[in-house]
Amino acid sequence: GTLLDDTWLCVEGINQALIKRKLAPISEAKYREVFTFPVRDYYMKLGFDFDKEPFEIAGDEFVAYYGENFHKTKLQNGSRSVLKAIQSNSISQSILSAARQDFLLDWVSAHKLDKYFLKIVGIDNQYAKGKIEQGIKLVNDLPYNEEDIIIIGDTVHDSDVAEKLKINCVLIDHGHVSGERLKKTGRKVFSNFKDLITHIL
C-alpha cells in the first residue's frame, strides 16, 4: 500500500470471497473505511461468519486470488523517485511488511527495487500476523538508535507498530486506509510522496 498500488487487487480478492458467500461486495472507498488489523476482524466487519466456517478458508481463497493476479500490480506514483531521493541523501531504507516474505521478495525483485533496501522483512504466514514481532527484530538488527528510525506507512496498524517500537512514523493516504482514519492517529498524514519527502529530508 505504501509503495505498491495493490488496494484494487485486495478489493477484487475480497469481493470474490464475499460474492461466493452471497454477501454484498464492497467498493474501494468502503474497503479503505473498514480495512484493519488483525485482518480477521476486517473479514467479520464485512459479514463473514466464522461460526459457519473457519477464517482460514476465506483467507486462503483471498491469498490464492491475490497470488494469481499479483503480477498485475504497479508501484504507487512517485515510489521510485522517493526511494532514489532518500538513498541519494545517504539514508538507509528497509521494508517491514505484513505481506508473506516470498510475496514481498517477489515484488521487490519484479520492480527492480532490491538496490534501495538494507533489509526486507515480511512475515511467515499469509494472514498478516506478526508485523510487530518482526518489527522488533528489525529494529534490533539495524545499526541505529530508535530516534534515528522512522516508519513511512499507509495504515493505522503502521502507527501502532511504530508506537510499540518506540519510533517515529508518518503516514500516506494513497494506500489501504482513508486519510480521515489515518489522521485520527495523530500522525502527520500526506497525500503524495512529494510532500512527504519534503518533510523527511
Provide a role label for each language-model segment.
Residues 111-121, 181-201:
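Structural recognition of alpha->loop->beta junctions
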Residues 30, 114-129:
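A short, structured active-site edge motif that brings together acidic residues
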Residues 150-190:
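Acidic, Mg2+-coordinating phosphoryl-transfer loop and its flanking beta/alpha structural elements
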